[in-house]
Amino acid sequence: MHPRCRGFQPHSDKVQHTLRDTHTLDTSHSRRHLNPRNSTSTRLATLSNGLRLLAIDMPWRATVSLSVFIRTGSLHESARLNGISHVVEHMAFKGTATRDCQRINLDAEALGAEVNAHTDKDHTAFHIEGLPGDLPLFVALLADIVLNSSFPADELERERRVIEQEFSEFEDDPVSMAFQMFDRACYGPSHAAGRPIIGTRANIRRFDRADLLAYAQRQYTASNVIVAAAGPLDFDAFARASESAFSAMPAGAPNLVTAPVWQGGLKTRSMAGSGQCQAVLGFAAPAMNDDTHLAHVLAAALLGEGMSSPLLDEIRERRGLAYHTACTTDIGPLAGQFVIEGSTAPAQAEEFLTAVEALLRQHADGGIDAVGLGRARKQLTVRALRALEQPSRRLESAAQELFTLGHLREPQQWLAKLQAVTAGEVREVFARLLDPQRPAAIALAGSVPARARARAAGLFA
């Protein structure tokens, strides 16, 4: 949700010689409703090795956020390497050629900052936030972590134990297990989209230092990296620091993967001691580069966003079947998911599933409530505009757009397309969800009664 480009020429001769395809973007999301001081601009540039720079100037903020996004995650792993992106991210903080683990922490905290990271299906990201004047130092620190991590063997042995504890927490949580099984039901085990980001215990125990070095050398290349900053920015200082830190990074080739094929089906896991049945059910949705995904986003908001939505009103308020239930979409670079989830008492799980099916059929067969559709549009609009005011959300969204689309989306164009989705298109979404040719994916975890399992197997038949 970001603006289109307008021409920009950098001022520094050094930056001019090392950057290309540089643009300025006006990202004021509504000049009629925003104070002028809150308007923002976005600049894009590319180093000679293909690494992209993204700068979102937010002059009213007192701090600056910096992230390095790498286009590699669990989607880019073979079954044998499943989990290695997550391990590399953990180990990146354990030392470089010039900094040990403690020195990384001290150098960040001496600036009042804190480094962090996360691994996702389609990317890995490293973050730091602090004072604007320290941005060049932040660039140098994250570059050292990304480019020069040494993955010490003794640290790897210790970190295995930490990740084993992470596995235990994950496997004790019905919500986490339900979503892991849901992905497996959607895409099967043969495609990386159906495998968990955390990997497998066997893989984590087998990976050695050579595996991590080889993976980072292959995947962490300039054509797969975006260095992104948001806050009150001196663009030339940011560009010079990035060029100095990253210009020697090998260009490499884009990390590409094939789109998964939807499978559907039922997965269940009984977990001793659980007092809840966690249900996740969903359907195939378009990927980010297909604008028809907007109708799915609007349909999900209509059905299950907010306490007044039909899903929460029926499931929680009228029937008391679940404390938490929601309908969302996960629109990714290769595929999307239309997801309904809920935590319910085991004795009520069967009724919960039946009620969800009835709501979907009601929206597929009947008319779409105009008031509810208007409510959903407003909720999505406010959510999108609020995200523009949050640096970390802005950077994450922009990086995903650049990796997936190759350009940034203009907020007003995205919102205009959302407004243009008709009630008929939303109803068609619900009708397609119930198409037996593309069966639902369903996962139940926790305390799973036999009747709920049987009901799930017969849903949407």
What is each residue range found by the language model?
Residues 61-72:
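Short, surface-exposed, low-complexity cationic segments
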Residues 83-96:
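Active-site SXXK
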